């Protein structure tokens, strides 16, 4: 795959994912610059060698795109805008960390981020910048325009909501920085997923494309769910023997109906406290499906069912597959799922199916692990309905 093609196509994928949360241009900019260092004569010589290959990673290519962006930012009319500089730093870290995250400040107080932004010699950076602009058919004015548009997205999609959160909750400064780190992880996740997905496509791994068009998945799943529940209700009524069994059945039905009706409320964090055997799995699934089905396609990315133990995850997955009527819509992800095929392993790390059943440990890895395969999944949580079973 040609480098220019990779940058453009990975950028298009990032744009489509980023647009779902209002940062399409911002995400595109990260991808268009992430491998800019590969335009260098040094890297091209390295990649084309057949014998005596240097050790993998010996030629740094991940810093150049960030340095190029920072250089153009310093020469732009926006170089004195504090929030714009914050955005450029977020993008720059995303680019420099796309092969592995690192601490910006080490234990000795050294600024490692600044070190990463001063790796490429000026002469080599000028060469890379010239080739990047030529091959990408970009002008400096076009890049400046993209930065300006990305800044607008950053303000609308992140800074304004963050300001609202801080005002409503009287959030301390340290918490504000935590939200900043979440934004950084989101950008890095979009970059890793877009990079890996495009590379997989170029290698012919069609299974790693977006697994399915979700336009009607949730509507179909909800219809199947309702038919499944009607079937269970009919079977149950035929087998009810005692008054106590009838009461339990009616309570379960009422709980499920109330959960379905609750889907009309706005987005938020809600708790469903019920005793064992009350039908939480199917009741919460009904709520999630109705929320997803009534929203526009772009507004609900996935439904997640998070369980504390593998055994519960396995049981819940089987229940959910039967309820939605199509196994291809449901992915089960935990350490007991054995995929010897490398392609299937990649699919597992991507979390692209409409409904994901996984364990709390995999969920926490996605939130906090330093491994790229976990970071990759992070952006899939955006605009999703997340059900946490037996949250501790």
Language-model features, listed with the residues they occupy:
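Accessory nucleic-acid engagement/destabilization modules that flank
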Residues: 3-228
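Pre-Walker A (Motif I) flank of P-loop NTPase domains
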Residues: 265-272, 301-302, 352-354
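Walker A/P-loop
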Residues: 265-289
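The Walker A (P-loop) glycine that initiates the GxxxxGKT/S ATP-binding motif of P-loop NTPases
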Residues: 274, 335, 390
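Inter-Walker segment of RecA-like/P-loop motor cores
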Residues: 326-368
């Amino acid at each position: 795959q040609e480098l220019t093609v990779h940058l453009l196509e990975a950028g298009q994928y990032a744009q489509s994912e980023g647009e779902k949360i209002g940062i399409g241009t911002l995400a595109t900019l990260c991808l268009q610059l992430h491998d800019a260092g590969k335009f260098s004569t040094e890297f091209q010589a390295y990649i084309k060698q057949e014998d005596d290959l240097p050790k993998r990673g010996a030629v740094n290519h991940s810093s150049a795109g960030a340095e190029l962006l920072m250089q153009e930012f310093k020469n732009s009319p926006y170089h004195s805008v504090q929030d714009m500089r914050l955005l450029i730093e977020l993008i720059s870290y995303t680019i420099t960390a796309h092969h592995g995250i690192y601490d910006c400040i080490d234990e000795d107080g050294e600024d490692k981020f600044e070190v990463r932004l001063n790796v490429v010699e000026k002469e080599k950076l000028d060469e890379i910048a010239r080739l990047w602009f030529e091959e990408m058919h970009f002008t400096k004015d076009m890049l400046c325009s993209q930065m300006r548009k990305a800044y607008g997205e950053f303000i609308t999609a992140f800074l304004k909501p963050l300001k609202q959160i801080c005002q409503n909750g009287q959030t301390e400064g340290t918490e504000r920085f935590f939200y900043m780190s979440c934004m950084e992880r989101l950008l890095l996740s979009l970059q890793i997923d877009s990079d890996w997905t495009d590379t997989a496509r170029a290698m012919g791994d069609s299974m790693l494309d977006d697994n399915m068009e979700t336009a009607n998945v949730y509507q179909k799943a909800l219809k199947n769910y309702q038919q499944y529940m009607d079937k269970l209700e009919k079977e149950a009524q035929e087998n009810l023997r005692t008054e106590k069994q009838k009461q339990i059945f009616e309570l379960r039905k009422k709980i499920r109906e109330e959960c379905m009706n609750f889907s009309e409320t706005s987005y938020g964090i809600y708790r469903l406290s019920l005793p064992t055997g009350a039908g939480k799995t199917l009741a919460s699934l009904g709520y999630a499906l109705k929320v997803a089905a009534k929203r526009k396609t772009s507004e609900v990315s996935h439904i997640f069912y998070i369980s504390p133990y593998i055994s519960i995850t396995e049981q819940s997955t089987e229940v959910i597959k039967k309820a939605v009527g199509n196994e291809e819509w449901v992915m089960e992800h935990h350490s007991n799922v054995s995929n010897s095929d490398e392609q299937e392993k990649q699919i597992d790390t991507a979390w692209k199916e409409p409904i994901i059943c996984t364990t709390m440990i995999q969920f926490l890895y996605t939130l906090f692990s330093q491994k790229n395969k976990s970071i990759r999944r992070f952006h899939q949580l955006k605009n999703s309905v997340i059900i946490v079973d037996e949250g501790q």
